[in-house]
Amino acid sequence: MKKIFLTFTTVLAMASCQNKQVNNTENTQTEAQSSNTENAMTLTQEWDKIFPKSEKVDHHKVTFKNRYGITLAADLYTPKNTQGKLAAIAVSGPFGAVKEQSSGLYAQTLAERGFVTLAFDPSFTGESSGEPRNMPSPEINTEDFSAAVDFLGSLENVDRERIGILGICGYGGFALNAALSDTRIKAVGTSTMYDMTRVSANGYEIKMTPNAQGTYDRVPGNTPEARRKMKEQMNNARWESAKKGYASYLPANNLDPKTITPETPKFIAEYADFYRTKRGFHSRAVNSSPEHSWADTGMLALINMPILHYAAEMQTPALLVHGEKAHSRYFSEDAYKQIGSKDKELYIVPNATHVDLYDNKAGKIPFDKFEEFYKKWLVVNK
């Protein structure tokens, strides 16, 4: 049972109080639901990003719908002083983050390098709509990328034959899945990728402490019996969740820097240093919230619906970027082996951890590599 709770908390909520996972008070749930609902489509016009605004690009807030009727909020970045139709890139992630954090930084930086870019909040999170709030869905979150392609392809200054996508962390997996489904996507990149369906079903397939080289040794994932117990736990909680319209939430994660101890896994401490400090905190991000986390039934689909089942059929050019010392490195290594694209590359950033690629605090995001990749497949070869 200990591993089950580890999987359940570190993947979706990282909740510090196991018993409260299925026993949030009704008042807390109602307040959280009301607050998120009222603010779901209030688009903040002021610059509230964790990174400075570039003078090299134009920025606009935009909205668009996916095929489920959910309205997504996004930031559109366009390089200044350009003419004609340009290549475009849709960006999202990390899992539990918002467009004002990592995805916006990636989007703005790539716009400085000549692309029209779109950083969007996934369905049910941030400024995007969707009820109940904070509900992950492998299908809908994959669809969000295709909806972003729809939007970009409708713009007069975008060549719809030159659209790519980029997913960060958990949205790296969803980006690969979107490229498998959507043949309009001409290039797919990932940064510090997670496969959220795999980690939800199997837990972390690593030892929780790095080895002497600073990397993480592999271990077997969850057994079918362990997954069965997880599903029983969540489905028992679902009775109460159904009474509240599925708007009951896991407690806030345990990323408060004050709770980090020497016994805390190193990568959890790194998450805390990003999401709960001035460095990367944003009030709309699930992972930054001190009040509540994901919807408590949200993990069910992630456990049961693997996203990369047909990875061998992928033909889209792919670039998978990961840190050498990231606990999550095995996701990119395995995905690289699985995907069938003849034009694929696994690029390992020396000495970088998972969170090093969330922002450029350590100067380790290989923007030159991303630029080279997207220009090759969206500009030079078109």
What are these regions (language model features)?
Residues 177-276:
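Alpha/beta-hydrolase-fold enzymes
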Residues 350-352, 360-382:
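Catalytic active-site module of serine/aspartate enzymes centered on a nucleophile-bearing elbow/loop
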Residues 314, 320-322:
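Short beta-strand/loop motif that positions the catalytic acidic residue
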Residues 85-94:
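Short beta-strand element of the alpha/beta-hydrolase
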Residues 109-127:
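Conserved alpha/beta-hydrolase
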Residues 96-108, 122:
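The serine-hydrolase catalytic nucleophile loop
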Residues 135-156:
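Alpha/beta-hydrolase active-site loop
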